[in-house]
A protein has these predicted regions:
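N-terminal Rossmann-like NAD(P) cofactor-binding module of classical short-chain dehydrogenase/reductase
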Residues: 83-88, 109-110
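Conserved Rossmann-fold cofactor-binding substructure of NAD(P)-dependent oxidoreductases
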Residues: 64-80, 94
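Rossmann-fold cofactor-recognition segment
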Residues: 53-68
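Rossmann-fold NAD(P)-binding glycine/threonine-rich loop
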Residues: 93-108, 112-151
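Conserved anion/nucleotide-ligand pocket segment
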Residues: 150-167
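Glycine-rich adenosine-cofactor-binding loop
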Residues: 11-26
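A short, basic/flexible loop-to-alpha-helix module at the beginning of a structural domain
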Residues: 1-10, 74
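NAD(P)-binding Rossmann-fold cofactor-contacting core
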Residues: 33-53
Length: 168
């Protein structure tokens, strides 16, 4: 059953394919018209790849890291006509860095929660407050202050209730 509510012509890159990615994908299919050849899922674990293969959606088995995210994501978000979109449903990927890249590429961005690169929470060289969720929230607000305007980025929309619930 489909109930198309929108059309998206650009590339869509979903980062992560755990429980939220698996729950969100069928809802995107139900409500958003998109070109499957421009949809790609990136995740370090391919245990659910069969769900993408049966939908003819491209899969890249790779972790998105601080060292590779620009090189990995830029061609995926700029390949072909239309503005790109990042759907970040992963952990251990810096939401702020990914938002900033999306902004650089004039791509939309959405995530369920603000995340840091691995190691922030356990970095003893930082104070407890510098390792807190409050500090992560402030880093998103700082990005907004430093780079006002531009294409929309939605952060911390939640998962379920949140991103999944919006589309049900």
């Amino acid at each position: 059953m489909t109930n198309l509510l929108a059309r998206f012509d650009g590339p869509i890159v979903m980062i992560g394919f755990g429980s939220i990615g698996k729950g969100t994908l069928p809802l995107i299919e139900r409500h958003i018209a998109f070109d499957r050849s421009k949809f790609v899922v990136i995740a370090p674990d391919d245990s659910n790849r069969h769900l993408l293969d049966e939908r003819q959606i491209r899969f890249i088995k790779q972790a998105v890291t601080k060292e590779n995210y620009r090189e990995l994501l830029t061609p995926l978000l700029t390949g072909g006509p239309g503005r790109g979109m990042v759907v970040n449903v992963s952990v251990d990927t810096s939401s702020v860095d990914l938002m900033e890249l999306a902004k650089d590429l004039d791509a939309f961005y959405i995530d369920t929660v603000v995340e840091p690169w691995p190691g922030l929470y356990t970095d003893k060289s930082l104070s407890i407050s510098q390792r807190s969720n409050y500090a992560l929230r402030e880093s998103v607000l700082d990005l907004r202050r430093r780079r006002p305007g531009g294409v929309t980025a939605v952060s911390c929309c939640g998962a379920n209730a949140g991103m999944v619930s919006w589309l049900v």
